[in-house]
Structures are given as structure tokens and as C-alpha cells.
Amino acid sequence: IEKVMRDNHLPLPSDEGTDGYWIKRGDATAQCRDDVRFCRDEGELAHAKDSFVQRGIQDVVVQAHVQGDLVKFYGVEGTGFFRCYYPGDDNGTKFEDDQMNGRPQHYPFSSRCLQADAEKLSRLLQTPVYGGDAIIKRNSDYVIIDFNDWPSFSRCREEAARAIVKRAAPALLLSSRRNN
């Protein structure tokens, strides 16, 4: 995902920074707390890389930590369905690391631009049903820090279900016609 984002000039964190690093497995979605780790410095990062290798995980992604508001987003490509939430508002987090930047400040940002970037990424990855995380910086810029297929849609399941049906209906109708 990171290579696709870089090649297509989509906003993602730098490889280097001064506020620490995140390391996560690059071969699959995070399945346990140790699959995504914050490292305060390059020494901790080196230790974390070794830990991943010991667990049999060779493919890792390293991103510089970005200060700002964590926003979770959910979308269904081509349907207009796109929702953003601040998990820090209600402590709706999967792992405590989601609270690394503290309570959200609700920095202004363009949800339309985030949606356009997420839709572009969904097309490039052929992932029409998607979710992810972004960090909104104080200056209103954002970076996408995670992107995956078939998220939980935990905060908008009913709306998402309608959008998924809308997205799938043409393909289902076409398939049905071919079988008749």
C-alpha cells in the first residue's frame, strides 16, 4: 500500500521524523497488539524490527509519528458513502495506541479531499469497500496512516450496508442475467 501511495502522490507519513516511529506488519492487517508498535527512537525501532523478525514477520512498514488528530474513515467507492469519526471523542479505540496524540483538537480539514484520496487509493488497490486512519495536522493537512478492505464499519453499519448493496447491485444483476 505504501508503495502505491508514494507512486501516486497520496499523502502518507515520512519515513523519518523527530517524534518517534510506528512499525507495523506489512504482510497483513494487524491481528494483535504487537503487530503495530510505537517506538520513541531509532534504538527502539531497531529492537522492534528484530522482534518482528523473531515472530516470522519479514515485511514491515515504518512511518514517522505525526502529531495531530486521529480520524477513522469508512467508504464504499463510487457510491458517495464516506464517513469520518474521531475515536478519541468517545474512546472507541481498538488498541490504546490510538490515543497517542491525546484528545482530538478537531483541526479543520477537507473531508472531501480525504474522500477523493481514499477513493483514488481504493481504485488503485481494487478495494471498493474500505476503511482507514488518517492524522489531521494542525495546519489542516492530513496523512493516511492505514488503509484496509472490509473494515468493521462499527459506527455506521446500516448506512454502509446500504452503500455496499448499491455498489454490488449492478454486478449481481449482470451475473444474474448471464446465468439466465
Protein language model features and the residues they cover:
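Conserved N-proximal alpha/beta basic substrate-recognition cap immediately N-terminal to
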Residues: I1-T18, A28-T29
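Anionic group-transfer/hydrolysis microenvironments
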Residues: G26, H65-V66, Y74, D133-I135, ...
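A short beta-strand motif that forms the metal-chelation/ATP-contact edge
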Residues: W22-K24, F73-G75, S140-R155
